């Protein structure tokens, strides 16, 4: 048998660094939401407070995961009463108050932008949006805003003392705290 030569251009370029967005183990999907300038400013401020090992691209994934865990805790609290959330929560503002979150300022329409989420977080965002839309009539952008505010609170209270953390460590920390 003859040996194949490894002199092809593909073989030569295999180890060359790629341009563009860095590759991830699981490819991310674009999800479109409307963000106001204030919400974009919150994201920019969060980037500076993230532990080493996390990057800006991890913020949407972690925010959606935190929201889905918090909604799951609410659902488990009323599991014996055939409800999704407790009786006292009648609108989105009461959910903000339950979680001690600042109410979002209504400063007009946001501009549509894409966020990149892992496939599991896209499913969780859809599930959270479905529940909150059925209960309160909210849209995907409002659900993402709620998740951003939740993650900002989590960053201030539970993640501020961590200097380094990977994405998996923060997901485990969220699960350990709330579940």
Regions found by a protein language model. Give the residues of each.
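Short Lys/Arg-rich basic patches
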Residues: 2-40, 47-48, 85-123, 129, ...
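Short, basic amphipathic alpha-helical segments that act as recognition/interaction helices
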Residues: 53-81, 136-166
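N-terminal accessory/assembly segment that mediates macromolecular interactions
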Residues: 23, 32-37, 42-72
């Amino acid at each position: 048998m003859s040996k194949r030569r490894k002199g092809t251009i593909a073989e030569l370029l295999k180890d060359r660094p790629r341009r563009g967005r860095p590759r991830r183990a699981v490819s991310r999907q674009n999800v479109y939401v409307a963000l106001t300038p204030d919400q974009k400013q919150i994201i920019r401020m969060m980037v500076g407070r993230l532990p080493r090992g996390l990057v800006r691209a991890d913020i949407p994934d972690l925010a959606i995961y935190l929201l889905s865990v918090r909604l799951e805790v609410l659902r488990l609290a009323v599991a014996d009463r055939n409800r999704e959330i407790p009786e006292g929560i009648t609108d989105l503002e009461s959910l903000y108050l339950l979680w001690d979150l600042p109410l979002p300022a209504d400063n007009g329409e946001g501009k549509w932008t894409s966020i990149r989420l892992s496939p599991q977080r896209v499913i969780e965002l859809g599930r959270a949006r479905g529940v909150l839309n059925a209960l309160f009539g909210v849209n995907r952008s409002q659900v993402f805003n709620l998740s951003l505010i939740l993650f900002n609170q989590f960053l201030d209270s539970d993640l501020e003392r961590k200097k380094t953390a990977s994405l998996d460590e923060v997901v485990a920390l969220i699960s350990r705290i709330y579940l």
